């Protein structure tokens, strides 16, 4: 992961509501994909980058494809890919057997929480300093 991307993403998890911690630091979101095949897409709501971790051992490999670059990555159990999901059109190919992956990402709109707690800064009804 690039240091500047890490710095941007980690500022979000450093100020989670109620001083909570993220189990997927420096990301704030986690998706569990079970037997998922996707159409070609970009993720416009993601912040900077996403990380994909393959956690199954399916027949053959998991093929992650990128339209703009023409790259087809044959991923196996334990492989990790980090890429800018807002900029690269991507999809995963059809497969046989079972396929499971974890996708780590952060929502780009989390920057509003960094700026002013989504408009709640100074509100007595929301204590961002206390743990629940």
Name each model feature, range by range.
Residues 46-48, 57-132:
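Catalytic core of Fe(II)/2-oxoglutarate
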């Amino acid at each position: 992961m690039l240091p500047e991307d890490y710095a941007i993403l980690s500022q979000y998890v450093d100020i989670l509501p109620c001083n909570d911690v993220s189990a997927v630091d420096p990301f704030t979101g986690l998706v569990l994909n079970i037997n998922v095949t996707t159409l070609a897409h970009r993720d416009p709501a993601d912040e900077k980058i996403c990380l994909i971790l393959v956690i199954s051992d399916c027949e053959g490999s998991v093929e992650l494809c990128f339209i703009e670059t023409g790259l087809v990555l044959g991923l196996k159990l334990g492989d990790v890919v980090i890429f800018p999901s807002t900029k690269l059109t991507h999809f995963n190919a059809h497969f046989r057997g079972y396929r499971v992956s974890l996708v780590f990402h952060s929502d780009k709109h989390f920057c509003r929480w960094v700026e002013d707690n989504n408009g709640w800064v100074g509100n007595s009804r929301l204590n961002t300093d206390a743990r629940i």
